[in-house]
Structures are given as C-alpha cells and as structure tokens.
C-alpha cells in the first residue's frame, strides 16, 4: 500500500506538462533578490512573496510539486491555511529540502560529500506532519583530471541511498539529485562518462538499501560540455 502511494505521488509530481518548482531559497539568497527590487528582507515580506507565487493561476496548470525552505513549510498564509495546504489546494505536492549542504570530503583535497543524515529520521517525521510528501537531497561532483574520485562517487551515492531509504520509511518520495557540475574544461564525452559512472553507483546503492525506485524521482544533470570548453566536436554541436 505504501509503495503504491509513493508511486502515485511521484507520478503526480512529474505529470505531463508540469514541473517541480524550486522555492527553497535560503533567507540569505532571497535577501539578494529582494534587495534588487528594494524590498526589505523580513518574514512578512517573504511570506507575502511566496503566498502570491503559490496562489497564481499557473500553479494548477504547470506545477506538480514545490520544494520549500524550512521557514516556509512552517508558515501559515494570511488567509489561514498553511503554505503546504495552499500548495495542495492547487493540485501540487509540497516538499522540502533536507540535506545540510556539501561539506569537504575527508581524504580528498578538493571534493565534497553532502551531509544531513544525523537526526534525519526525526526531521522527516516532523516534516511529514507539517504536510511534506516529498524531499530533496543534492550531491555534487566536479570534473577535472583527478576528479571525481572513486571515493567521492561512492561516498555521495551511499549517502543518497541512505537518505532515500529513510524518506520512504517516512512515507515520502525522495528526489535523488546527483549533480555533475558544469565547471571545468571537459568536453561532452567526459561529462557523459562521469555522469554514467555516478548514476550507476547511485542505483547500485539504492538497490542495496532496498529503495523502491517507482517511489523515487531522479533529478539528473544534462550531458553537455563544460562552461570553459572551447573546441566543440560535432557531437557537442548537436
């Protein structure tokens, strides 16, 4: 029953013609956006901005899910319902980013591993009670002559799988986001090779951790040459 429910949520999030809205800007990030339009960065203004966004007519037609920030999922609208209730009213699924960010990977000079597993089971229980029905966790990989290392690929895949298993245990759908960054000087073939290795390792770990893939959503990077690559091959131009 739980597996069927998770699959239905995942399908609703990714319904044809709809996308997932990333509205999980941190307080610091939204401050920069407000500054550009001379709006004070206070909770009232942040609530009004998001409430206006989630009340728009486009929500029903184009949005299948909304990723929220911790502050936002706890807020109530000026009309009474909570933000998650408002999102659900418009036919979208409320979700929450749960990772704690990419931190330096011990044993590697310039790579990261995403943290946030400590206390995650308890946080997931609270987020479910607040109305979340899916979550997001992002791992990042950089490409260079030395990177990503096997250590980085394995460490991040293991963390993603542990996260996904905990999320499904909490009756929510995990978005699995292993992102190979565009930074560097690599071509499209290198991006393809690294992304393939990263995804293979992620799905190996998901299987080991008994994650039901039908109750997950994959958020992959695009296969493209990096930002600094200057000698495109015929394949790069396609």
What is each model feature region?
Residues 1-130, 143, 231:
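Alpha/beta catalytic barrel-like cores
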Residues 25-27, 70-72, 100-102, 139-145, ...:
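Active-site-proximal loop/turn and secondary-structure-junction residues that shape catalytic pockets
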Residues 41, 112-119, 148-159, 186-198, ...:
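Alpha-helix N-cap and loop-to-helix initiation/capping positions
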Residues 123-130, 134, 163, 169-170, ...:
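Alpha/beta enzyme core
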Residues 42, 137, 176, 218:
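Conserved, mostly hydrophobic/aromatic
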Residues 129-149:
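A glycine-rich phosphate/pyrophosphate-binding beta-strand-loop-alpha-helix module
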Residues 229-238:
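Conserved small/polar residues in nucleotide/adenosyl-binding loops
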């Amino acid at each position: 029953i739980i597996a069927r429910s998770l699959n239905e949520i995942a399908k609703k999030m990714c319904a044809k013609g709809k996308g997932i809205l990333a509205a999980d800007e941190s307080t610091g990030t939204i401050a920069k956006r407000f500054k550009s339009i001379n709006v004070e960065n206070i909770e009232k203004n942040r609530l009004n901005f998001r409430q206006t966004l989630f009340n728009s007519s486009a929500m029903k037609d184009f949005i299948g899910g909304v990723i929220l920030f911790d502050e936002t999922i706890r807020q109530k609208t000026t009309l009474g319902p909570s933000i998650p209730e408002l999102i659900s009213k418009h036919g979208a699924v409320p979700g929450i980013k749960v990772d704690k960010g990419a931190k330096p990977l011990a044993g590697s000079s310039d790579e990261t591993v995403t943290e946030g597993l400590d206390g995650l089971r308890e946080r997931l229980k609270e987020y479910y009670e607040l109305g979340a029905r899916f979550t997001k966790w992002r791992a990042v990989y950089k490409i260079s002559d030395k990177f990503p290392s096997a250590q980085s690929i394995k460490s991040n895949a293991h963390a993603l799988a542990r996260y996904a298993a905990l999320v499904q245990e909490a009756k929510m759908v995990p978005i699995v986001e292993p992102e190979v960054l565009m930074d560097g000087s690599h071509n499209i073939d290198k991006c393809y090779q690294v992304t393939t290795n990263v995804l293979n390792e992620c799905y190996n770990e998901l299987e080991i951790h008994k994650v039901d893939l039908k109750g997950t959503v994959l958020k992959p990077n695009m296969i493209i040459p990096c930002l600094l690559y200057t000698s495109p091959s015929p394949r790069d131009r396609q």
